[in-house]
């Protein structure tokens, strides 16, 4: 989806750009119930990997507009975060695991993770 679920972030113009209770309360129980392994979103202009109850949440919103400022709030679900680079996420699924590689526009690796299937 476009909008985020769990996320680190800041308050901008009165809006909380982090851990969205509306999407968390409505959709994350379904992700957990039906065994969803990974959820991708953007909207926030940052890179982040978050994990909660066996579901990995990947935010990759850094290939367009201005990058977000450094986060003021750190989500308890956050595993890794960056708002310093324009980037994309390269995903390879190999049977029981997914390899996530966050890359800058030139392909340089910023970070990588192996996510096992639930």
Regions found by a protein language model. Give the residues of each.
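Long, structured stretches of catalytic cores involved in phosphate-ester chemistry, encompassing
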Residues: 1-110, 118
């Amino acid at each position: 989806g476009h909008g985020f679920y769990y996320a680190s972030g800041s308050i901008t113009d009165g809006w909380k750009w982090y851990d969205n209770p509306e999407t968390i309360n409505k959709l994350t129980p379904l992700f957990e119930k039906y065994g969803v392994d990974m959820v991708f979103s953007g909207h926030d202009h940052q890179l982040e990997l978050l994990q909660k109850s066996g579901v990995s949440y990947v935010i990759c919103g850094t290939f367009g507009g201005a990058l977000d400022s450094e986060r003021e709030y750190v989500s308890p679900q956050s595993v890794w975060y960056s708002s310093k680079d324009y980037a994309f996420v390269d995903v390879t699924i190999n049977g029981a695991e997914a390899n996530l590689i966050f890359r800058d526009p030139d392909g340089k690796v910023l970070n990588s993770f192996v996510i096992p299937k639930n």
